[in-house]
Amino acid sequence: MRVGIGYDVHKLVDGRDLIIGGEKIPFEKGLLGHSDADVLCHAIGDSILGAAALGDIGRHFPDTDNRYKGYSSLKLLEEIKRIINEKGYYITNIDSTIIAQKPKMLAYINNMRKNISKVLDISIEDINIKATTEEELGFTGKQLGIKAQSICLLNKNI
């Protein structure tokens, strides 16, 4: 068994869709980034790669590569799954947290879990997503951006 952690943060800006966990969430701002800036998928991807000691998403999908401009982070997760499977690893479970003052995430979490379980080809019961605020403190509390954290447990085929 191997464990990895992931963390990501993106700034909220006007003129972009808000995509979290592959789900388009109605909100007046979206996250700024080279890809679709899906903060949750990025944290999950980093936790998976970290558990396999394979670096991070920046190494595999650099923001200097135009192939990933506007790229779906769900597709990044599909690629990450392929990468770890080639090394003999499979995902046991994922636990993650979205940190955002607004919008409220509860209504979207089940669809996020479905989206992520589908692209990673794991049971929805093996993915947990929580949401919290920072009680109007700091970067997320002042609604300047959104953060996500993730932990992943991998096993290796013998």
UniProtKB/Swiss-Prot annotation:
It catalyses: 4-CDP-2-C-methyl-D-erythritol 2-phosphate = 2-C-methyl-D-erythritol 2,4-cyclic diphosphate + CMP. GO terms for biological process: isopentenyl diphosphate biosynthetic process, methylerythritol 4-phosphate pathway; terpenoid biosynthetic process. One of its GO terms (molecular function) is metal ion binding. The keyword Transmembrane helix does not apply. Binds 1 divalent metal cation per subunit. Pathway: Isoprenoid biosynthesis; isopentenyl diphosphate biosynthesis via DXP pathway; isopentenyl diphosphate from 1-deoxy-D-xylulose 5-phosphate: step 4/6. Coiled coil: none annotated. 4-CDP-2-C-methyl-D-erythritol 2-phosphate binds at residues 8-10, 34-35, 56-58, 61-65, 100-106, 132-135, 139, 142. Homotrimer. Involved in the biosynthesis of isopentenyl diphosphate (IPP) and dimethylallyl diphosphate (DMAPP), two major building blocks of isoprenoid compounds. Catalyzes the conversion of 4-diphosphocytidyl-2-C-methyl-D-erythritol 2-phosphate (CDP-ME2P) to 2-C-methyl-D-erythritol 2,4-cyclodiphosphate (ME-CPP) with a corresponding release of cytidine 5-monophosphate (CMP). This is 2-C-methyl-D-erythritol 2,4-cyclodiphosphate synthase. The lineage of its organism: Bacteria, Bacillati, Bacillota, Clostridia, Eubacteriales.
